């Protein structure tokens, strides 16, 4: 009976070990993908996120913007007026809208600067 109990325990440990190793590999792959995505954003964008307290993705969600363009950032005007305190809405929401617009403006400036730098680089 002890022999069977030992076999059951060993088999259970093997199954758990395999599943743990598989989960560890998946987590490692996911963290590598996230690191690659952050790496493409650039150091200036990360610094802008730290200063404003909002990531680019959060700012886009607040202003309901799918892609970053100056035309879509104009959605800010509507959301700012709708959440005006004098109309009876929340000053907190209005300040979130303002911070989101500031963050997107910073990102647009960073992109414009990067485009200018790419244009000035000599072609080889």
Curated annotation (Swiss-Prot):
Keywords: Membrane, Mitochondrion, Mitochondrion inner membrane, Phosphoprotein, Protein transport, Translocation, Transport
Bilayer topology annotation: Peripheral membrane protein
Gene Ontology terms: biological process: ossification; protein import into mitochondrial matrix
Subcellular location per the Swiss-Prot or TrEMBL entry: Mitochondrion inner membrane
CC terms in the record's Gene Ontology section: TIM23 mitochondrial import inner membrane translocase complex
InterPro entries, per the entry: J_dom_sf, Tim16
A Pfam short name: Pam16
Region feature J-like, mapped onto this chain: 58-109
Subunit structure: Probable component of the PAM complex at least composed of a mitochondrial HSP70 protein, GRPEL1 or GRPEL2, TIMM44, TIMM16/PAM16 and TIMM14/DNAJC19. Interacts with DNAJC19. Directly interacts with DNAJC15; this interaction counteracts DNAJC15-dependent stimulation of HSPA9 ATPase activity. Associates with the TIM23 complex.
Family according to the record: Belongs to the TIM16/PAM16 family.
Domain comment, as recorded: The J-like region, although related to the J domain does not have co-chaperone activity.
Function: Regulates ATP-dependent protein translocation into the mitochondrial matrix. Inhibits DNAJC19 stimulation of HSPA9/Mortalin ATPase activity.
Protein name in UniProt: Mitochondrial import inner membrane translocase subunit TIM16
Source organism (scientific name): Rattus norvegicus
């Amino acid at each position: 009976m002890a022999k069977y109990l030992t076999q059951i325990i060993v088999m259970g440990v093997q199954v758990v070990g395999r599943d743990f190793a598989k989960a560890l590999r998946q987590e490692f792959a996911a963290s590598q993908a996230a690191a690659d995505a952050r790496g493409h954003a650039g150091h200036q964008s990360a610094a802008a996120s730290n200063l404003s307290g909002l990531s680019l993705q959060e700012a886009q969600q607040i202003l309901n913007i799918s892609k970053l363009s100056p035309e879509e950032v104009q959605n800010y005007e509507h959301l700012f007026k709708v959440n005006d305190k004098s109309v009876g809405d929340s000053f907190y929401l209005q300040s979130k809208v303002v911070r989101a617009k500031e963050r997107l403006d910073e990102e647009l400036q960073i992109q414009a600067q990067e485009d200018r730098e790419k244009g000035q680089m000599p072609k080889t």
